[in-house]
């Protein structure tokens, strides 16, 4: 692990540290006074730093939301590890390589034409990504993490990746927070296989908006919701829809306190 820089975020005590693991960049924040809770976030470019976010100036405001909810609940806020995706000018498909659920979206799986990668050299590497996250990054930054007090969060393809992580690494964390999970990359069969593989012991949050691409989500998300009920997740599962909410960091930040409360209030 090599440190790149440290910076401050308005409304957040202490510093965010930017480090590098080989070619992988990671931002992390550990609250003053310590904590035993850990939140692992995909698309780390968008978590703390408006200069690196997809939509300039828009971030998740994740630490601010975590501080607010934790104060409300009377607990120490969680540490946050924000893992950057791999997309660069040279590798525009890096994010997809990291986040596509490798064991479920194979070359034989139906993929909506809008999301197909034409490059024959494209190879999904999400298993490598999660191996690095759980076996290298987390132990180095937050070595005393426990599954019971660890959650993973992501949006869009990061939402699917979060659910995939629960399937592939159920022993590493126990709460999956998937905002605007991008089910429409495929079809009902893909969604069914993933839902049926989710560990029944985990808490799972899913949500969607009603603007932009999120308007396409209801049919498959409703299908997923029914499967989750049938599987017997009970109060360990919560699915919500938000008005005037789109497919961007600003929208997700507006209701981020709700999935965080779902996780932390237990």
Role assignments for model-derived ranges:
Residues 1-266:
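Non-catalytic cap/lid and distal C-terminal segments of serine-dependent acyl enzymes
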């Amino acid at each position: 692990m090599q440190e790149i820089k440290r910076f401050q975020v308005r409304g957040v005590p202490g510093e965010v540290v930017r480090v590098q693991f080989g070619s992988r960049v990671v931002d992390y924040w550990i609250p003053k006074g310590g904590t035993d809770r850990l939140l692992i976030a995909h698309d780390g470019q968008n978590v703390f730093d408006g200069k690196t976010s997809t939509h300039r100036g828009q971030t998740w405001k994740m630490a601010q939301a975590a501080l607010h909810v934790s104060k409300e609940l009377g607990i120490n806020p969680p540490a946050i590890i924000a893992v950057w995706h791999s997309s660069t000018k040279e590798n525009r498909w890096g994010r997809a390589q990291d986040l596509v659920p490798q064991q479920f979206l194979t070359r034989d799986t139906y993929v909506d034409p809008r999301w197909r990668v034409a490059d024959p050299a494209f190879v999904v590497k999400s298993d490598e990504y999660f191996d690095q996250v759980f076996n290298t990054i987390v132990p180095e930054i937050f070595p005393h993490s426990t599954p019971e007090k660890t959650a993973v969060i992501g949006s869009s393809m990061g939402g699917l990746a979060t659910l995939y992580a629960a399937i592939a690494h159920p022993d590493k964390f126990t709460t999956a927070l998937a905002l605007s999970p991008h089910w429409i990359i495929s079809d009902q069969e893909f969604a069914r296989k993933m839902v049926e593989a989710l560990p029944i012991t985990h808490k799972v949050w899913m949500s969607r908006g009603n603007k932009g691409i999120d308007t396409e989500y209801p049919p498959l998300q409703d299908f997923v919701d029914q499967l989750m009920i049938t599987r017997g997740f009970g109060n360990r599962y919560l699915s919500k829809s938000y008005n005037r909410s789109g497919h961007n960091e600003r929208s997700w930040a507006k209701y981020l306190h709700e999935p965080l409360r779902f996780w932390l209030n237990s």
